[in-house]
Amino acid sequence: MNCHKRSNGKNRDSYGSSVAHKALTKEVVAQRLALPNGPEHMMHYASEAFPFAYELFSEGNSAACAFLCRCAKQEKYARQLNDIMGSEREALRNALLSSQPKLRKNAAVLMGQLKVPSDVKYLKQALSVEDTRFVRPSMLLSLGSIGGDEAKAALVSYTVQPALSEEERVHFEAETEAYKTAMRSFLTFEKHEFTALNRPCEIELRSPDKLSDPLARELAEHGFRVSAVHRSDVHVHTEDMMGLFACRCFTEALIEISANSNPDPKSMGIKAKSFLEKLLPACHTGKPPFGYRLEIRGEGNIDRLAIARRMIAVMDGETLLNCPNNYEVEIRVEIGGNGGAFMYAKLLTIKDERFSYRVSALPASMHPATAAAILKYAEFFLGGKDARVLDPCCGSGTFLIEREKLYPCAGLTGVDISNKAIDIARSNAEAAGSIAKFVHNDCMRFTAERPYDELVANLPFGNRVGSHRSNEKLYAGILENLPKWLRRGGVAILYTMEYTLLKKLIREHPGLRLVTEVRTEAGGLMPAIFVIKIGQ
């Protein structure tokens, strides 16, 4: 097995470490958003920054609108934005008619992300009076994204004005491409079903940071030969694509197109086109074309739009069509710090039903793959089958459900102070066919009728508690209760953002033995996993 840390520059930047412990305020969020790539970097703190960003957006802050556009790609934030704005959508309409071209552009993008049919009339009105060419493509694309008869009629009646000068030619080409892409949204593609890979491919499985070893172990247990292990991904060379989804410790599976190659857009487009024209028809039912979406990631000064245009110009044809509002394949380009490009295909035709039990979630809910990977990391310290397990801060129930997926349990109990959390946890447990039971209570008041074998907890932090001082009180109370909740020799697995605090408190409890720990990285934060045994 080839185990090493990748040095291609794909690791996250150091932005997060400089503000990880600085409380966010409206002023801090405004300052950070104004920095180069500010909206992208603030996604590390999305849940904390979101309310401040919306307030700034309502005041006409273009960077805040760009940040909300990124948030709206996630369903929970899109739903939250639509709830906040209601049917009047005054803030969005005002932004669309602002005197700032960038704000108008970002507002149009946000409308496209939110996909509310009633916004079409505002986009039509704004497009009819828009005199800044670089803004129009976003309005056209959003009409295509929202869809419907009214949007289609608006696009059919629209004419891209010719370039009046050489300087306008770039904007003319961008507007023309946006118009074509928007119109493609109304094409009826034949829906394809994934059958199987027709040949072995290099598959990169993304794991939570520093939890790639548990994933590699899980893959080996399912008969896969691991070819490489990096800090946050594992590689396998296989044609059994569907078999990979028996494993739970990864967030996504990417088929590698090329690795550390020339980042020239034309060269990348040719490679992606050649690779996918052979792969897609061979492993799907139905005939081409396949709609795709191009995602370009990377640090530093990267002109994503220019790269995308040049790649699309090469790739589009009988087999592939750029259709970001109606796609079955995501073509992902990740440009590393050393300049090398990594290209992947993510097939949305593959139905990943591993976590389909998660019918609802809370804003701070842990990703199920993270819960699965943490449990796999601590597997050798767990009680195995027939253990009784407690989660005193259960939230949506993910940790308990994933514990039961690892090994059958004799009992699972979740406690949470939030009625909403308990309702969500019960719904998820029912969908999972879990035996878990949930209790609405303050965990500090919860008493165990008889000691449990294991405890798992994603400890609250930040706005979920209120302050560092509140964390200190809560964490001290939980550690004080561990010997009451767990039998002697029992195990507690704690996941927390408060590494220093929790480690200090553990030292102050001689009846608790720290067995192992690991610090990871998640969205710019530095969570830690602690495995504790009760009794020396």
Where would I find each of the regions flagged by the language model?
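Non-catalytic nucleic-acid substrate-recognition regions in nucleic-acid-modifying enzymes
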Residues: 160-163, 186-324
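Nucleic-acid modification enzymes, centered on SAM-dependent nucleic-acid methyltransferases
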Residues: 287-373
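Class I S-adenosyl-L-methionine-dependent methyltransferase catalytic core
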Residues: 2-221, 336-536
